[in-house]
Each structure stands twice: as C-alpha cells, then as structure tokens.
Amino acid sequence: MEKRRVVITGLGTVNPLGNNTADSWAAARAGKCGIGPITQFDASEFKCKLAGEVKGFDPETVVDKKEARKMARFTLLALGAAAEAIQDSGIDCEAEAENIGVIVSSGIGGLPTIEEQHSRGEEKGMEKVSPYFVPMAIANMAAAQIAIRFGLKGMCTCPVTACAGGTNAVGDAFHRIRDGYEPIMVCGGAESCISPLGIGGFTSMKALSTSTDPDAASLPFDARRGGFVMGEGSGVLVLEELEHAKARGAHIYAEVVGYGANCDAYHFTAPAPGGAGAIGCMKLTLKDGGIAPEQIDHINAHGTGTHMNDSCETAAIHAVFGDHARDIAVVSTKSMTGHLLGGAGGIEAVFTALALRDQFAPPTIHYEQPDPECDLDYVPNVGREMKMEYALSNSLGFGGHNACLAFKKWEG
C-alpha cells in the first residue's frame, strides 16, 4: 500500500495560557506562566495549592447552556478546542462527514463529575444521581461529543494511555490517514481533574509539587524540581491527506512524518531505568519517518518536573542522538502550562507545529539551577529563533506507555 503524506491544516486549544491558539502561542513564545492558586475547590487544607487552570472559558460559545449541563468539563474544553481547529481548517463537515474521523484522548475522564455525583448519592441515595452521570464521566465522551457536535461519521476512538494518550491520538490519526482509511482526522487530547480527589490522589503519590510560588513550582530539568503541577485543557489538530488539502487550497502548518509507540513493561508509575522505553520509542519514530537522528533540531519533551522523568528522558535523548543531543533545543512547555495528563500530547503537538512554522523554540521557564543529570540545551527562560526542519514531541505515561511524534517544517 502506498503511504500517503499527512499535513496539519487546523489547530485549536484551550489551556492555562489562553482560550485559543493565537493567545496561547503568543504566551508560550513570551514565556508566560499559566500556573496559579487553585480556585476550583477550597485547597487551603491541601499540601498542593497550585494548578494550571483554564481561565474565563465560556462553554456556551460551543454548546447551549442546557447541553453544557450534560457534559463534564473535560468534554467542554475538548469541544472548544475542536471547534477552533475545525473552523481554522476550513473543512466542510457536512459534505465530508463520512470521510472525517475523531481520535481524542482523556486519561481520566470526568473525575470531578464522579466526585460530585458520589456526594449527591451519599446524601440522597445512589439511585438519585444524575441520569447523565455515566455519559458525562466516561473518558471517550470528548471524542464522541466532538463527532456528534460536528456530524463526523468516520472512525471515533479514545486512547486511554494516561499521559501518553494525546500523542497516541495524534499518532493513530496520522497512521489512519497515511494508510488510506480516512482523508481527514480530528485528533488530540483533553483533561480536567483539578478536584479534591485528583489533587489528593497525585499528592499522595508524591507526584505533585507542593510549592506555593507559581514561579517555583513547575521546574522541568531544574535541580530544584519536586513534582509536576496539574494542568487542564485541550489541544486538537485537524490532520489531512496532503493531496486532499491541496485540492481545496487549505493552509498547512506542518507535516506529520513519523510516529512511535511502545511500553516499558517495567513499573506502573516509574520509568524504566535509563529511559529504555523512551529510547526505543524515539527510535521507532525516526524509523517510521525515515529520519536520521542528526536531522532533529527541536524536541518538545515530556519534561514533567519530576526527578525520575526528567533525568530518564535526558538520558534517553543522549542515547538516541549521541553527540548531536547537545545541538537539539529541548523544551518543556509544561513549565508554563503544567501537566495536562491525557491532554498534554494534544497541546504539545500544537506548540511543536507552531514552532516549526515560526522557526522559534519556546522557552523552558523557571530554569535556574542546572542538574548534572539534566545537561542538555533546554532553551532556558527566553525563547529562541532558530532554523529547524524536523521536531519531535514526546509523551511518557503511567503504565509505561510511551509515544512520540515527528513533524517536519512545511516548505509549500
């Protein structure tokens, strides 16, 4: 089967840096911090008091008030991002309905909805929970509601692979088009679990930063790092077969050229020693795209700000790229957004495509104290104009799920 070329024709995002792509990318370029005190519940008695919250998003710009009440927040954020991406792409959803698929990930789904309805059940009896509880809470509903809202009748799925899910979604969509199944895919990830149980659970694992200073909380690759900061939001892309995009005169941001996915098969939360799984995943991606290691100029790293992730990912980059590793601009945009879990791969794919378009690497902010175990070029604190042809985006999830995408600058 002849492999078809795949390009990005639409971008959309709602995240702690902004409620659309233009505002979010401007903030990322400028090194703005989207992290602040938790406002979605009273966190005064919690060790963790900071998160990357979406601010000022109005779901009624996407669905009416009655319908919004039937959806969890992660679904509404996904609909906001998808609406922007679809409008940006200029695709005719009605005319192309049978040709457009949806793959959108969520790692946890409607956790706040589960908490709210459990409290209601405890108070009034479990048979008095909302009849919309189950369809609000299940993780596939972001993908399903996007398909319903826009009438998209191609394949519709939801990878639930923790923090790798958004990247799996984009990668699976890429292969779906490349291998001839659909010409257009709407793909990405969404998450919103800034709630007592979500924050409490990750704090109990000692995964979250307990800093009370927004400028000293999300510290990827810095020696002071002590855990990630929870973020929320969604990033959605429209991928399209190249000739289909050209035929309708679509604007093209970048080309998707490679995808790899594998499993550590080591531990349910800790990465494999030396980043073994990440090494294999990046190698699979380069092989899939026919890319030589020395061709990679930029990596949007998983870069969570936990001690083990950042040192293992750095070791993996050294192992894959050898001496060239020090010439790569390795960035963690989680320093600005926090960690969007299943939504991370979506927004980071958006940022990587824009980095290639603008020939600009956004910074890793809050970087002050180098760690001998993290010794790459992390573009500290100030973004950088630079020539780049190929870029990777890494996502490494609980369960040992690893996913990586390769993008190429569009020369058209």
Predicted features and spans:
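A glycine- and small-aliphatic-rich helix-loop capping segment at beta-alpha/alpha-beta transitions
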Residues: 22-27, 112-126, 176-179, 199-212, ...
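Phosphate/pyrophosphate-binding loops at sites that engage ATP/ADP/AMP, CoA/4′-phosphopantetheine
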Residues: 85-96, 245-249, 282-298, 320-324
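Active-site-proximal alpha-helical scaffold in enzymes
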Residues: 78-91, 139-143, 147-191, 229-250, ...
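Condensing-enzyme catalytic core mediating Claisen C-C bond formation in acyl metabolism
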Residues: 5-9, 32-36, 213-289, 297-298, ...
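Short glycine/threonine-rich loop-to-helix capping motif typified by GTGT followed
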Residues: 266-275, 304-321, 326, 340-347
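Conserved beta-ketoacyl condensing-enzyme motif
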Residues: 8, 24, 29-161, 190-199, ...
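ACP-dependent fatty acid/polyketide chain-elongation machinery
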Residues: 1-67, 243-253, 350-365, 408-412
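Glycine-/small-residue-rich "gating" segment that lines the acyl/pantetheine channel
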Residues: 123-130, 171, 175, 191-247, ...
